[in-house]
Amino acid sequence: MKKKQLHKSNRLVTMLLLVMAILMPYGGAWAQTASQPSEGNGSEGSPYIITKAEELAWFRDAVNNGGYEICAKIADNVEVIDLKDFCHAADASQNLKELSWEPIGNSDWSYVGTFDGNGKTITNLYINATQAYMGLFGIIYKSTIKNLTFENANVTNTENDIGILAGYAGNGNTLQNIKISNTCQIKGGNDFTGGIAGYLDGNAYNCVNYATVQGTEDVGGLVGYFESGKPSKTVPTMAI
């Protein structure tokens, strides 16, 4: 009788270990799952209220799967959205493989909504890419993005159109109250590299960048290439 109970216990332990192995993703960290915000419906009058990185990732996925007009706002009671579990450099000591952020808005579904950072901060944005249009947002058109600070962003791209906020901001965008802190770094490998946006067609109001920007051609502290519009009270930093 005791032997049967021992076998049952061993089988139970084995099953639990198998379940844990399945839940543990390749790379040594627990899987991060995007989750829909519990407040808002994505309209301009009732934007999705973002309270954590999981909800920002869900918003990204919703935009990139056809919801290109939805609007979002970071919650009043949140100070920081930390993306470290959704994008990070490789770390052998933690058995972590590199995970690059997939931008909001792409060549299939360019973002055209309003995103209000509500005076909050996004930290630990990490991008290391070999394709164009890289930033927190990839491609945006006629959108409004405002009231947002970035800290500890690390963005590298070997192609064109790269910025910490947006890679390509074309055709009538409004960027307002955007701050890139000196804890951020950005390095582009081709045309159009900027601290806030690689390419901008639109208006930029009260935008500041304290990070050093490196690139090869059409490099700017604020934007790499400014097509048209009005920059007002903007402070670029050194571009190399």
What are these regions, as identified by a protein language model?
Residues K2-L16:
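Bacterial N-terminal signal peptides that target proteins for export
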Residues A29-I240:
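Surface-exposed repetitive/solenoidal architectures
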Residues T14-Y26:
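Bacterial N-terminal signal peptides
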